């Protein structure tokens, strides 16, 4: 029994020795993948995660936390864009320093355009712009001088409105016959004196008597048909008052009905027209004797 028990103990010891490395490896893997923050002395190890500096593309962040190099993305070895011999303020040196790193800003479709800052280039562009402006002003001045002649005034537009209610333009100096013809033509084009001369113009009342309808046989009080000079061409409406007539007419007497039937009695004798309200548009003025 002793040899058998010794063999069993030896087998168990060998089994323990074989399983110990595998358990240690599993423990190390679990500890490395732990989400806990590592200690100050323990190095940081991240498994299957993106770099800690996040985006390292076009905007060129460093993928290592403590990297102090210039970040030459052209690779190791001699730099083909070595501008060490150039001056520090030259555009070549600036361009070389820029090519050694990713751009600091987005330079895509809507991005900024890199232009080397050069005072000489700015001076050249400004001088070219001033020269172009000077040539343009000189050419404009020469064109004005060469194109001026005696008929330049006649080509200008009239100084004022020359329509129906407008002013007659001043006649230019020239032939007397031509001036007379032009004045006659302009006079014929003007509106009549006693007619409507515009949208806001007034109409003369001196010629309104013949435009009224003749006196008919109705003899009513509606006041739309009047004699030529009756009521001074004023509107006589239904709402107008009718004053009493005194009996010194021509054989008519004081009959009020006769005054209504014969409205022309106002013109006979020494009778004046009534001063009362005779319509919707105001009073009727007294007729001159």
Swiss-Prot record:
GO terms for molecular function: neuropeptide hormone activity; signaling receptor binding; tachykinin receptor binding. Residues 25-47, 285-289 form a propeptide. The modification Arginine amide is found at residues 59, 110, 165, 200, 239, 281. Residues 24-94 are annotated as: Disordered. One of its GO terms (biological process) is inter-male aggressive behavior. It is found in: Secreted. Strong expression is seen in a group of 14 cells plus one isolated cell in the midgut of stage 17 embryos. Also expressed in a pair of medially located unidentified cells, just posterior to the brain, and in two lateral groups of cells that may be associated with tracheae. Expression in the larval gut is restricted to cells with endocrine cell-like morphology in the posterior midgut, just anterior to the malphigian tubules. In the brain, expression is detected in a restricted number of neuronal cell bodies. GO terms for cellular component: extracellular space. The modification Valine amide is found at residue 153. Residues 60-69 have a biased composition (Basic and acidic residues). The modification Asparagine amide is found at residue 95. Its main location: secreted. Keywords: Amidation, Behavior, Cleavage on pair of basic residues, Neuropeptide, Secreted, Signal. Residues 1-24 form the signal peptide. The keyword Signal applies. Tachykinins are active peptides which excite neurons, evoke behavioral responses, are potent vasodilators and secretagogues, and contract (directly or indirectly) many smooth muscles. Stimulates gut muscle contractions. Required for the response to the male sex pheromone CH503 which is transferred from males to females during mating and inhibits courtship behavior by other males. Belongs to the tachykinin family. This is Tachykinins. The lineage of its organism: Eukaryota, Metazoa, Ecdysozoa, Arthropoda, Hexapoda.
């Amino acid at each position: 029994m002793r040899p058998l028990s010794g063999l069993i103990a030896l087998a168990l010891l060998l089994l323990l020795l074989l399983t110990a490395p595998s358990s240690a490896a599993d423990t190390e893997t679990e500890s490395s993948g732990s989400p806990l923050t590592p200690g100050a002395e323990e190095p940081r190890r991240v498994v299957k995660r993106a770099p800690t500096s996040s985006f390292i593309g076009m905007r060129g962040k460093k993928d290592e936390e403590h990297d102090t190099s210039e970040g030459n993305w052209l690779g190791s070895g001699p730099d083909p864009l070595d501008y060490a011999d150039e001056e520090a303020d030259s555009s070549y040196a600036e361009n070389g320093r820029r090519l050694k790193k990713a751009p600091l800003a987005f330079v895509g479709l809507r991005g900024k355009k890199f232009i080397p800052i050069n005072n000489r280039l700015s001076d050249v562009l400004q001088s070219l712009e001033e020269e172009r402006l000077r040539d343009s002003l000189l050419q404009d001045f020469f064109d004005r001088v060469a194109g001026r002649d005696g008929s330049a005034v006649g080509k200008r537009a009239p100084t004022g409105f020359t329509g129906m209610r407008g002013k007659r333009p001043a006649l230019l100096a020239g032939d007397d016959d031509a001036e007379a013809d032009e004045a006659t033509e302009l006079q014929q084009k003007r509106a009549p004196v006693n007619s409507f001369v515009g949208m806001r113009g007034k109409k003369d009342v001196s010629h309104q008597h013949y435009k009224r309808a003749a006196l008919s046989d109705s003899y009513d009080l509606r006041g739309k048909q009047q004699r030529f000079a009756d009521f001074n061409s004023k509107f006589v409406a239904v709402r107008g008052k009718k004053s009493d007539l005194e009996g010194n007419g021509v054989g008519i007497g004081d009959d009020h009905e006769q005054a209504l039937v014969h409205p022309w009695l106002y013109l006979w004798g020494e009778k004046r027209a009534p001063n009362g309200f005779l319509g919707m548009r105001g009073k009727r003025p007294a007729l001159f004797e």
